[in-house]
């Protein structure tokens, strides 16, 4: 049982799915044009038609497959979805005289979607088309000053529409509205971390069988670490997790990963490949070349180690739902568990000729759901809530050639910055924070002596999706404290700068 979200190109479609799941209801995203058969495979109790950039009166506008609107389940249209419902039922949709974008107050609201909601209702608008004439059987249940038809419903056919985005944080009571839709759909709200873990373990045991051996590459991040714990519960000693220390990790990271996973029953093999990686990177300054070399060395190290460990039947990967969503802008990944191995962002790509079957337990989960599972499985918070860390590690935060000396400098600076964020209670408010060792050296004075030392850049950002990001407005006093600590504790550095560039135009990482 699920809520199926048909995606017509809205940037917020994933948020709809996440909001339903936060409310305890399993939801899936399919292309807006998904066939009736494909939708039926999800056994939907309700359907959502997402927003999108198209206009319903455009002949090229995407439309649900024939028969979707006739299904005997409640349907909620959001923005474009509402306009489509009205248009298909015989109503009129026209270009709005005034485009509405941003926050708007509902001047009145009611009906089943708004049941139990009281007080001011602020909605996030983003539309240039409007419903100008209602189809038969529908009634207006909400309006704003500029949009007389802001929400509609047909309680007999159980068709509902809103001309705003209930899924975004800018619509504070949107969660209550979505909860009301779930109530209308009579969805069982049992999508909890405990339920997910129980189902995933059963699925893995069914796929792997009683004797299958599973190989997993560990990066030290939350996804692969959580996957290791889940697989250990599912298949025990038949899991072998391989952690490759390439010398590009953060300070003490190898020891932290070993201390976190081994006591929880993970059969962990650590490979010391620092010499091979750093040797291959010697003399290389180009960022793309560094990435390629690291990817190649990962494959070599992984192949060397797996050759020692014997035969495996399955390769586990921490693929997440956003990687395989059947969206308007992409294609659905193969669900067959077939043998072609795709590159994993944490290990720089695995060889295509590894003839394993894939085990991807997290392919239906969002990142926040993995974190919830991690907590249930006992993963320590310092790993569970850790910021994203790139597969190439500190190599792409050490601008120019990577050397052991530079890495040691960067590790200490990074540790001071991240530890400081935790100490000041700022870490969880940042989506990602990092230090960059630049190739810039500048003149300074320490004591009575002239210095000519490195410049480091600190960067922290906030983001919901990592597609765009804002630089984090960290307090001046905190930044001053960090600068003081860094130049006093890391003598090879005499200048600290803070990156205040958003994404775009910059990327989060410097390389």
UniProtKB/Swiss-Prot annotation:
InterPro entries recorded: Class_I_gatase-like, GATASE, GMP_synth_C, GMP_synth_GATase, GMP_synthase, GMPS_ATP_PPase_dom, NAD/GMP_synthase, Rossmann-like_a/b/a_fold
Classification via PROSITE patterns: GATASE_TYPE_1 (PS51273), GMPS_ATP_PPASE (PS51553)
Record domain Glutamine amidotransferase type-1: where: 2-190
EC annotation from Swiss-Prot or TrEMBL: 6.3.5.2
Catalytic reaction list: XMP + L-glutamine + ATP + H2O = GMP + L-glutamate + AMP + diphosphate + 2 H(+)
Residue numbers annotated as active site: 79, 165, 167
Span of domain GMPS ATP-PPase: 191-386
UniProtKB keywords: ATP-binding, Glutamine amidotransferase, GMP biosynthesis, Ligase, Nucleotide-binding, Purine biosynthesis
GO cellular component: cytosol
A GO molecular-function descriptor: GMP synthase activity
Pathway: Purine metabolism; GMP biosynthesis; GMP from XMP (L-Gln route): step 1/1
Annotated residues for binding of ATP: 219-225
Known partners and oligomeric status: Homodimer.
Known role: Catalyzes the synthesis of GMP from XMP.
Protein name: GMP synthase [glutamine-hydrolyzing]
Organism in which the protein naturally occurs: Deinococcus deserti (strain DSM 17065 / CIP 109153 / LMG 22923 / VCD115)
Recorded name of the encoding gene: guaA
